[in-house]
Regions:
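N-terminal signal peptide c-region/cleavage motif recognized by signal peptidases
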Residues: 17-19
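Bacterial N-terminal signal peptides that target proteins for export
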Residues: 1-13
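Pepsin/retropepsin-fold aspartyl endopeptidases
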Residues: 22-384
């Protein structure tokens, strides 16, 4: 298993109205995408200027302050929304005269402009989000590494036996997945999230009251993710093992999840490891199209490090969460060396696009300094 400096870097969901849609009624845009650490990124043009945009069904169209300045956009009224960790966030509303994806051009698209200096701008220029995507059919062809946005169903290979109805929601795609034989969870398909499945604490509370086969592996206080408003605060998290999970009538086994304080559970981009995904927004249908080699039930267990390092805004690395309470390290203790590489101070902005370290294998050695101390201590941590 490989782990980066943040468990997830998920951009928040600001609810804005549906954009004006001035392209032809029938269209098909096909563009290649690149996968950078679970983030699927395409190249497109806004007002004639090239940019790198994240494909994100969990957020509206967005542009960075730097990209907006470069193409001469003027910020409009402020809007308030909620980020992926459930915290309030504000951004300015802007209008994009044109957005060209492949051979198709869309006109008068609303977007949100991030604040100046947002570290996300080190990685991408913006987001291609739900307020445009919901006007057609989207498909991620994972074997060809292509993203398709179209109004035409022909040639998409949609299989009704692998379909789920979209649940009522004016913004993001929501579906019901089955957990075991009796429990269900209402989840957002968030292509901008790195993980496979993140369970909301609300769902965990419901499961504890039912006779679910889901099992809590460990509980700890800590921080693991970043939303549009920055790194989340310290909260209680649970690592849960779900023996069986069904998505669009395809069965997965041994699903490990970490709870989130977001308003809804999420399916993320790791689902693309096992098949294609298509969403027919006009016909309110979600498809998971497993790769032919995948056999049911498909085991997707992911081991977890006993200590998860997290980078802070001031450039230090700390123990974001400690799952093994028997270890001498505590949440918040500073980490100054990983795998023999010193990491006393990290450029936070650069670390967003280039993770400063990787954790790999089944064990590694770290050097940490307990809070209130100056003494460095060595510790071997395991991934299991």
């Amino acid at each position: 298993m490989t782990s980066t400096f943040l468990r997830s870097f998920v951009l928040g969901c600001l609810l804005i109205s549906t954009s004006l849609f001035a392209a032809a009624q029938r269209f098909r845009a096909i563009v290649p995408y690149v996968n950078e650490g679970g983030k699927l990124i395409v190249s497109l043009k806004v007002n004639g200027q090239q940019g790198r945009f994240l494909l994100d069904t969990g957020a509206p169209c967005c542009v960075s302050h730097e990209f907006a300045t470069r193409i001469g956009l003027k910020a409009g009224e402020m809007r308030t929304g909620e980020d992926s960790n459930g915290r309030a966030v504000q951004a300015s509303l802007v209008s994009l005269d044109s957005l060209q994806l492949g051979a198709v051009t869309f006109r008068n698209i609303q977007a949100m402009q991030w604040e100046k200096g947002n570290p996300t701008a080190q990685l991408i220029d913006g987001i291609l989000g739900y307020n445009l995507l919901r006007m057609g059919i989207v498909k991620w062809d994972t074997r060809q590494r292509q993203f398709i946005f179209t109004t035409l169903t022909e040639g998409l290979g949609l299989d009704p036996s692998r379909a789920l109805p979209l649940l009522p929601n004016d913004y993001v795609p929501m579906v019901a997945v089955r957990l075991g034989k009796t429990a269900n969870d209402t989840v957002m398909f968030d292509s901008g999230a790195e993980g496979f499945y993140e369970m909301s604490n609300r769902q965990r509370e419901r499961l504890t009251k039912s006779r679910s086969t889901a099992r809590i592996l460990s509980t700890a206080d800590g921080t693991l993710s970043m939303g549009a408003s920055g790194i989340e605060g310290v909260t209680t998290k649970h690592r849960i093992l779900i023996p069986q999970m069904e998505i669009a009538h395809f069965r997965f086994a041994d699903v490990a999840t970490i709870t989130t304080d977001g308003t809804a559970s999420r399916l993320g981009s790791q689902l693309f490891n096992y098949g294609d995904v298509a969403i027919d927004f006009p016909r309110r249908t979600f498809y998971f199209l497993p790769h032919p080699a995948q056999k049911e039930p498909l085991k997707v267990y992911q081991p977890e490090w006993e200590v998860v390092p997290t980078i802070t805004a001031d450039g230090t690395i700390v123990a974001g969460i400690v799952w093994n309470a028997k270890l001498p390290i505590c949440q918040g203790d500073r980490i100054v060396e990983i795998n023999g590489k010193r990491c006393e101070r990290i450029d936070f902005a650069k670390a967003v696009s280039t993770p400063p370290f990787l954790l790999s294998g089944k064990k590694t050695e770290i050097v940490f300094i307990p809070q209130g101390s100056t003494e460095e201590r060595r510790l071997t941590i395991h991934c299991k």
